[in-house]
Design a protein with these regions (language model features):
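Short, small-residue-biased leader/transition segments that mark boundaries at the very start
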Residues: 1-2
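Short, glycine/charged-rich "phosphate-handling" switch motifs in NTP-dependent
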Residues: 18, 30
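H-loop/switch region of ABC-family ATPase nucleotide-binding domains
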Residues: 6-7
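Charged, flexible cofactor/metal-binding loops and thiol motifs
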Residues: 32-136
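A short, surface-exposed alpha-helical micro-motif characterized by mixed small hydrophobic
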Residues: 12-14
Length: 136
């Protein structure tokens, strides 16, 4: 078993069978590589993948960035560290994302994610990552 820590998602795709995506020191998604790349369930993973330049079609000339700033690791709150930057947090009632740390749960076979938002909403949003012509 080999562990590698990197921000180079191209390397991950080539050398790994499984990937753990981390944000603010916590695993937010853990799954086989193809599931993470084509069916991500954690909002941070979706943002990370959206920021990769595409070699297909015409680009806008600008990279897509995750809005906001990373949290201070010195003063993390009690909720999800990604909540202030998350497109799904506003859909979760009672400010749960900001106040309660989500658990890492198995949301599909051998695919774990840490998020309070409705799984179906996240799964629907993740379809934009499926390769053209169908899922891998």
């Amino acid at each position: 078993m080999l562990f590698r820590s990197t921000h180079d998602l191209g390397v991950v795709a080539e050398v790994a069978d499984r990937v753990n995506v981390m944000y603010a020191g916590k695993i937010v998604e853990s799954a086989p590589v193809a599931d993470v790349y084509y069916r991500p369930l954690a909002p941070y993973t979706m943002g990370l993948l959206s920021s990769i330049p595409s070699v297909y079609g015409k680009g806008t000339g600008q990279l897509q960035a995750i809005p906001g700033q990373p949290p201070s690791l010195i003063s993390l709150g009690s909720g999800c560290a990604f909540a202030p930057r998350c497109e799904f947090a506003k859909q979760v009632p009672d400010g749960k994302c900001a106040s309660v740390q989500p658990e890492l749960l198995e949301e599909a076979a051998n695919h774990f994610a840490r998020c309070h938002a409705d799984r179906q909403s996240r799964a629907t949003a993740s379809t934009r990552f499926a390769p053209q012509g169908g899922a891998a």
